[in-house]
């Protein structure tokens, strides 16, 4: 099994499979953050454009696919996902959610991704048992919204 780890806010770094029941399947194959577009200007009497070659890294989304072992009962997967999602934010009296910054360590692809998570809201696939009746495994996709790419490291 491929090991990936997660730190929520300033908490302890934990293995996603043993701690949350999320077994790593795949993730984006990103070697660097995208760059913001170059600033350009052009004039009708001038051929081409003027281009300022200075730019910085831009925000991006990092997608991770996990499977959740349901052990023949979809309710088990629902409970694991709900428990995981509840760790990602705090909620005030008015039901406003404030998301915590997460640090995702993809030891397989040697990347450290820092950003704000989107909760897991739906399954991408259900894998059934050999009789086609029970959901043994539920596949989900999780997104980390990277707002400050300078915190990420693509060579850990």
Task: Walk through the language-model features, giving the residues of each.
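Extracellular/virion structural assembly segments
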Residues: 1-156
